[in-house]
């Protein structure tokens, strides 16, 4: 069945689909946390970030902002029928563990947690040290 444009905006409404298991990618930097939940094929089901959850500036880097973003993404994924997820965590940010706990607390069963942070084999030169 083709998707029909909605009346008011003219955009295409997202179709509700039943996806029982998927993958949650948590990208946690020092400034923000982005949670993307996809099916096993890689099609994005839902996503949320600390910024899209209403936090601004330095507050986006906090663990509480990561928790709020993860809960928001998980709620939308559960509405699509998701039950089990594998979690891929990337980055050095403060919201890594908090986001995982929030996904579990929202009612998703976590089957695997993997750290996929890219580590260079002495690649690019890092930025200079800050002197404050």
Curated annotation (Swiss-Prot):
SUPFAM superfamilies referenced in this protein's UniProt entry, alphabetically: Translational machinery components
Gene Ontology molecular function, alphabetical: rRNA binding; structural constituent of ribosome
One GO BP annotation of this record: translation
Recorded GO CC terms: ribonucleoprotein complex; ribosome
Alphabetized UniProt keyword annotations: Ribonucleoprotein, Ribosomal protein, RNA-binding, rRNA-binding
InterPro entries: Ribosomal_uS11 (IPR001971), Ribosomal_uS11_bac-type (IPR019981), Ribosomal_uS11_CS (IPR018102), Ribosomal_uS11_sf (IPR036967)
Task performed by this protein: Located on the platform of the 30S subunit, it bridges several disparate RNA helices of the 16S rRNA. Forms part of the Shine-Dalgarno cleft in the 70S ribosome.
Similarity comment text for this entry: Belongs to the universal ribosomal protein uS11 family.
NCBIfam families on file: PRK05309.1, uS11_bact
Assembly information from the UniProt record: Part of the 30S ribosomal subunit. Interacts with proteins S7 and S18. Binds to IF-3.
Protein name: Small ribosomal subunit protein uS11
Organism: Cyanothece sp. (strain PCC 7425 / ATCC 29141)
